């Protein structure tokens, strides 16, 4: 529970307890300016973090946070399916500037949502959020050094135009309005209910039902043990297995550090410990994939019933960390399988039937409820249509600069995190570097920064070089990355700390300019 000052009068208002959920939905009452220095798109964990760093490092700059939905929190407000939780520890997934105080390092969605909203309220960021405001397009004028941003009210449909010098896109990487569901033959014949986790009905009761979860990713391995507590039985149907590893829900050492060193210092030490641990695991898997596969298999076999077909259901055809490794707190998925409350089927769907699904092997799986945990619909840069001096920007023709800007697109930054570690570790560094860039621009007396690719023949590859299906479906619509810095997107936290936090901002590929129509650019 938070305590905010409300009201006016001579006493300056009264203290009123306000829940974190209420804070995340508090509307702005004062008139909002149509022109600001920075527009931050998205009021999720990345957008709130970006706002914190911006107002800390540049308190003189005006900004607003545009949120398309009616509440803050992003993913953690949108997803409401049973068991929703992080798959990274909160000491690294949380903000560097705000300690995670809960004893659970793998936390459920409600706790993470409260944490994000509390951070916004503590720093006054919640008062900068404009809810129900969807960004449709943004048009850049080099002569004015301004973006004209068209937004639409989700409540009235009214469209207005805002103006800013910078856009920081923190709206995530997937569509909020719909998840991905493949076309299943015969789906209309199924007499039960079919739901997607992204739009989970709050009144859905799975008690006593036969539940079929289609998928094998993080959402599926979260849902299965959560539903298995009350369902008659839960079956996870997967086309291809994923690597699944148990992790402790509570970090005993982190909790001891907090007790010994205090909240701030204990959190900082635990965060550093877990960063090093994540890096070590990823590097081991990259360098010794066969050994990593054997080790994971050994853990799986130990946690599953004797004689269980581990190789059939938990032995992917790719190496560890070619796709994201699924973490299950305290091995809850394996426990549900051991206890007979859940099972795994590895096969392909031939068609839906009236009572379940028919598999290509000829086997039938009966179900009362089918959950399609089949992934996301990726949407780069929040789906914003960008135009630079009258020319439309085609994302697939751009190359990512330092993992935060696009070649040829001035004064536009975005937040994309790690796929091999906690997402927000990278986002925090990008926010810091963005603020350093603004400081450098102030020192040089310029108001335009544009990455320019000096070598058009440089070999490129996909920006998100990741094997997950939801990425592969849209790979040709996303920006590219190069084969060298600063055009190569790094997955190395230590290297990014050096590049984004410590090395000079100036770079030959980053061109600076002024809005006074000067004919010559100011190069890095």
Predicted feature locations:
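C-terminal active-site-capping segments
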Residues: 428, 432-524
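Beta1-alpha1 glycine-rich phosphate/pyrophosphate-binding loop at the start
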Residues: 20, 33-40, 45-129, 238-239, ...
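Alpha/beta-hydrolase fold catalytic core
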Residues: 303-366
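Glycine/threonine-rich phosphate-binding loop and adjacent beta-strand/alpha-helix elements that clamp
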Residues: 373-442
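Feature captures the FAD/FMN-dependent oxidoreductase FAD-binding
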Residues: 103-175, 351
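Short beta-strand to alpha-helix junction loop
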Residues: 100-118, 214, 284-293, 319-332
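Core beta-strand elements of the Rossmann-like FAD/NAD(P) dinucleotide-binding domain
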Residues: 36, 156-166, 207, 360-369
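Rossmann-like dinucleotide-binding core of oxidoreductases
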Residues: 32-35, 39-40, 45, 49-50, ...
């Amino acid at each position: 529970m938070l305590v905010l000052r409300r009201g006016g009068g001579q006493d300056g208002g009264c203290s009123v307890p306000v829940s974190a959920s209420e804070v995340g939905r508090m509307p702005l009452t004062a008139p909002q300016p149509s022109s600001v220095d920075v527009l931050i798109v998205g009021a999720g964990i990345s957008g709130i973090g970006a706002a914190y760093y911006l107002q800390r490092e540049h308190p003189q700059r005006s900004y607003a946070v545009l949120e398309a939905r009616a509440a803050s929190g992003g993913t953690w407000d949108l997803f409401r399916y049973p068991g929703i939780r992080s798959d990274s520890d909160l000491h690294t997934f949380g903000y560097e500037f705000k300690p995670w105080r809960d004893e659970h390092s793998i936390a459920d969605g409600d706790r993470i949502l409260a944490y994000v909203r509390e951070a916004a309220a503590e720093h006054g960021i919640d008062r900068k959020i404009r809810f129900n405001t969807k960004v449709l397009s943004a048009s850049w004028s080099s002569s004015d050094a301004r973006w004209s941003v068209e937004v639409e009210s989700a409540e009235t449909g009214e469209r207005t135009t805002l103006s800013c010098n910078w856009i920081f896109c923190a709206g995530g990487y997937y569509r909020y309005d719909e998840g991905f569901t493949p076309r299943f033959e015969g789906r209309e014949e199924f007499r039960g209910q079919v739901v997607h986790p992204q739009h989970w009905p709050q009144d859905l009761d799975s008690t006593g039902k036969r539940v079929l979860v289609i998928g094998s990713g993080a959402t599926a391995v979260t849902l299965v043990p959560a539903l298995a507590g009350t369902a008659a039985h839960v079956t996870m149907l997967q086309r291809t297995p994923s690597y699944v590893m148990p992790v402790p829900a509570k970090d005993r050492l982190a909790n001891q550090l907090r007790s010994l060193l205090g909240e701030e210092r204990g959190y900082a030490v635990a965060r550093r410990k877990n960063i090093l641990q994540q890096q070590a695991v990823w590097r081991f898997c990259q360098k010794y994939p066969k050994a990593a596969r054997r080790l994971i298999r050994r853990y799986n076999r130990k946690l599953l019933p004797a004689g269980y077909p581990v190789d059939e259901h938990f032995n992917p055809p790719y190496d560890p960390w070619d796709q994201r490794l699924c973490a299950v707190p305290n091995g809850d998925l394996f426990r549900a399988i051991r206890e007979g409350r859940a099972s795994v089927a590895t096969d392909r769907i031939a068609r839906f039937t009236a009572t379940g699904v028919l598999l290509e092997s000829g086997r039938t799986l009966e179900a009362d409820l089918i959950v399609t945990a089949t992934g996301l619909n990726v949407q780069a840069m929040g789906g914003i249509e960008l135009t630079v001096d009258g020319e439309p920007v085609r994302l697939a023709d751009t190359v990512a600069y330092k993992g935060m800007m696009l070649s040829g697109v001035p004064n536009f930054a975005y937040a994309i995190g790690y796929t091999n570690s906690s997402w927000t570790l990278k986002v925090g560094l990008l926010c810091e570097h963005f603020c350093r860039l603004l400081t450098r621009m102030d020192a040089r007396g310029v108001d335009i920064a544009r990455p320019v690719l000096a070598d058009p023949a440089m070999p490129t590859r996909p920006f998100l070089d990741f094997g997950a299906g939801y990425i592969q479906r849209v790979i040709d619509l996303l920006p590219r990355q190069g084969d060298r810095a600063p055009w190569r997107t790094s997955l190395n936290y230590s290297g990014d700390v050096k590049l984004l936090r410590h090395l000079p901002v100036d770079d030959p590929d980053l061109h600076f300019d002024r809005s006074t129509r000067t004919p010559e650019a100011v190069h890095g």
